[in-house]
Amino acid sequence: MQHDDVIWDVVGNKQFCSFKIKTKTQNFCRNEYNITGLCNRSACPLANSQYATIKEEKGICYLYMKTIERAAFPARMWERVRLSKNYEQALEQIDESLIYWPRFIRHKCKQRFTKITQYLIRIRKLTLKRQRKLVPLSRKVERREKRREEKALVAAQLDNAIEKELLERLKQGAYGDIYNFPIQAFDKALEQQEDASASESSEEEEEEDDEESGKREFVEDEDVDESDLSDFEDMDKLGASSEEEKSSGEEESSEEEEEKAPKAKSKGKAPVKGQLIRKRQHVEIEYEQETEPQHKAKVT
């Protein structure tokens, strides 16, 4: 049968213990079931037959309990209870499981559970947070990279100065038809000139558009038929022929008033253009002039 005082006398009172760590100020215990981590009578898991502690496995907290009834069965000595992830519910589970246990054990279990919960929360925050990865670099490689950067900077400045000088000489016409410089610089200069000419042409087009903005024009209607146009042409021809007839009639009226008096009375006033259009289709009139007294011939 297990006797706690005998075990403590053997292990704790200046005797050998494989879990004990001695220091100048205090002794510590490395046993994984120790509730406080200190080597003393109340916290020793070997010298207490009724004992309880909190352990964490893969982010989950468990309550371990040991009683004197299971001391004869080492394989079933510890009873394990899984605690809830909710902090308040886990504390209630500890109180219910350790209701008849010493107050010291119950208080230390809650304290240990609180510490474990805090460092689990801290681990989750660190995993979600971005961390800088420090890559070691030897001094030799660092000096080499620095020298390469300086050389590249000097070469870039030299290339820019040469390009600028060559472009100035090209503008001044110092080379004529021979260009002994990189073709990229020449292409860049040509592109700049093309951009300048394009901008000038666009400005001229804008000015022309501004000048022609107030101009008015007459545009032909696309819905007019050819038959309508032919009718307008016939009207113009008939109007011109009627004017010719009228002028010739006025010249001859003075000479032929006596002969044509009855005919003139029958005709009356000058016909309207609409009537002329209808008569033009059936009647044609011709006039002849002679040295003798003129005679008008009517042809039907």
Curated annotation (Swiss-Prot):
Belongs to the MAK16 family. One of its GO terms (cellular component) is nucleolus. This is Protein MAK16 homolog. Keywords: Nucleus. The keyword Nucleus applies. PANTHER family: MAINTENANCE OF KILLER 16 MAK16 PROTEIN-RELATED, PROTEIN MAK16 HOMOLOG. Residues 263-281 have a biased composition (Basic residues). The gene is mak16.
